[in-house]
Amino acid sequence: MKKLVLLRHGESQWNRENRFTGWVDIDLSEKGREEAKAAGQLLKDEGFVFDMAYASVLKRAIRTLWTVLDQMDLMWIPVTKSWRLNERHYGALQGLNKTETAQRHGDEQVLIWRRSYDTPPPALDADDERHPSKDRRYAALTPEELPATECLKDTVARFLPYWHETIAPQIMDGKRVIITAHGNSLRALVKYLDNISDEDIVGLNIPTGIPLVYELDDDLKPIRSYYLGDQEELKKAQEAVAKQGKA
């Protein structure tokens, strides 16, 4: 049996302010830093050890991973960062308050933008300063790879090749792996692992800073999955994520 740990970054400053974040490089809030520290301690207490780690290229995921590995005395293990693990790109919604956006466009429309599988938010203009082509960390990407907006289907399409080509072979080889990423990039992977339908994925909410453990067979098919920690706190955290886009 193989184990994989997925961890959504700790609360970011824009999570705290209930704003659409996407690819904007916002740091952790004070609460988020504490969540990351608690996640690392919990993993250590539960006897987890990792051989390698993966993160997005956004600081809220990177800092969460740093903190977790520091707590576990594993800062020496190899860490690979990839834009393919980035949060879903929220297009022109990035920076907007979710509640105010729901008041303007309606709860139903915002729920579609946030949670539907194949409906992207309005796109950023190519000359918008928020467009990823303006950020040098993406300088090596082709124009076709750079999103101006994404739906979850798009996020799946960029994440899964990286999973199959880079991460999965390491797990198959016996490496113990942690992936620290984002709500929607992790939803994309969970959708694939658990074979969740396009319709049912709408109801999946991944809370910040709580480790999600997958036990996998030799073909990397899930045997079971579970969150570590207090289950009542988990339920509250998932409900809070679900309510974020309501007026």
Swiss-Prot record:
Annotated substrate binding sites: 8-15, 21-22, 60, 87-90, 98, 114-115, 183-184
GO MF assignments: phosphoglycerate mutase activity
GO biological process, one term: gluconeogenesis
InterPro entries on file: His_Pase_superF_clade-1, His_PPase_superfam, PG/BPGM_mutase_AS, Phosphogly_mut1
Enzyme class: isomerase
Residues annotated as the enzyme's active site: H9, E87
Pathway(s) this gene product operates in, as recorded in its UniProt entry: Carbohydrate degradation; glycolysis; pyruvate from D-glyceraldehyde 3-phosphate: step 3/5
Residue(s) at site: Transition state stabilizer: H182
Coiled-coil segments: none
EC number per UniProt: 5.4.2.11
Cited Pfam families: His_Phos_1 (PF00300)
UniProt keyword terms in alphabetical order: Gluconeogenesis, Glycolysis, Isomerase
Gene3D superfamilies referenced in this protein's UniProt entry, alphabetically: Phosphoglycerate mutase-like
Matches recorded under PROSITE patterns: PG_MUTASE
Known catalytic reactions: (2R)-2-phosphoglycerate = (2R)-3-phosphoglycerate
Stored HAMAP family: PGAM_GpmA
Family: Belongs to the phosphoglycerate mutase family. BPG-dependent PGAM subfamily.
Function: Catalyzes the interconversion of 2-phosphoglycerate and 3-phosphoglycerate.
PANTHER family per record: PHOSPHOGLYCERATE MUTASE
Record's protein name: 2,3-bisphosphoglycerate-dependent phosphoglycerate mutase
Species whose genome carries this gene: Chlorobaculum parvum (strain DSM 263 / NCIMB 8327) (Chlorobium vibrioforme subsp. thiosulfatophilum)
Lineage start: Bacteria, Pseudomonadati, Chlorobiota, Chlorobiia, Chlorobiales
